[in-house]
Amino acid sequence: MARKKIALIGAGQIGGTLAHLAGLKELGDVVLFDIADGVPQGKGLDIAESAPVDGFDAKYSGASDYSAIAGADVVIVTAGVPRKPGMSRDDLIGINLKVMEAVGTGIKTHAPNAFVICITNPLDAMVWALQKFSGLDPKKIVGMAGVLDSARFRHFLAEEFSVSVEDVTAFVLGGHGDDMVPLVRYSTVAGIPLPDLVKMGWTTQEKLDAMVERTRKGGGEIVNLLKTGSAFYAPAASAIAMAESYLKDKKRVLPCAAYLTGQYGVDGLFIGVPIVIGENGVERIVEVAFSAEEKAMFDKSVNSVKGLVEACKGINAALA
């Protein structure tokens, strides 16, 4: 049986962490690509030299030529500039749009059948542009956002309740920005919805609202602490969960930025919604019912993404 091939575009902090996790989880062989020659080769060699200690047999290679990603089963894109303190994800749009054009061309030429996961910010606009530049089937390209945002929410909830994170489910939809939509009534501890836990006296509505707000600002909190870049452990773990569901046909239900064709009243945009990821890529888009308040929050989030997509079209006429 041929081993799967995982191509990582961008060998920065997230790229290196992705490469390590892919090996530890035995997902396949890894090629790291980066325009900074030497960096992908060095990180690949370093991780390969950890394999005898950790007991995994993934093969690692590094490259600065897109031909190295040929035939990849999964491509995970982290290339671009990260946020610095004081920046929003949206401030990155001009620089990272140019990066998506180069990456999209590389994927189109060398790995047109891959399942592609985009992590580059501003996420919802970059995955939209990457699909346009690569010409990929929209079912084969998603953005990593909701898995990370939900994980942050789950962490805060587990800490508040002093319970295992495994027993906490959380639901964060919408764009990957400050207008994201953490859905409290669909989030649970051991199947008990959060509003019920408030009634049971486990927490207060004020504390719950504060955790929702902290989730929205979760990326910025880490940017402000690190001062030199943005989060990478949790984003990498989130993308690996998505890749694993595809490679192993697990059919996990995960919130991801997926291409909508009328669902949720949205057409032609990538927005964070629950999807089923299996061997065919995005196999189902799960449409949940919103309350009036949730719908208003979701629509606001969609409008933010629309604005970013329009900005992309303004920068690059080929996208219009």
From Swiss-Prot:
Superkingdom of the organism of origin: Bacteria
- An annotated GO BP: lactate metabolic process
Instruction: List residues binding substrate.
Output: R83, R89, N121, R152
Q: Which reaction does it catalyse?
A: (S)-malate + NAD(+) = oxaloacetate + NADH + H(+)
EC number, UniProt record: 1.1.1.37
Which keywords accompany this UniProt record?
Answer: NAD, Oxidoreductase, Tricarboxylic acid cycle
Q: What span is annotated as the signal peptide, if there is one? A: none
Give the NCBIfam families listed for this entry: MalateDH_bact, PRK06223.1
Family (UniProt): Belongs to the LDH/MDH superfamily. MDH type 3 family.
Main function? Catalyzes the reversible oxidation of malate to oxaloacetate.
Q: Which HAMAP family match?
A: Malate_dehydrog_3 (MF_00487)
* Name this polypeptide is given: Malate dehydrogenase
Lineage of origin = Bacteria, Pseudomonadati, Pseudomonadota, Alphaproteobacteria, Hyphomicrobiales
**Gene assigned in the entry:** mdh
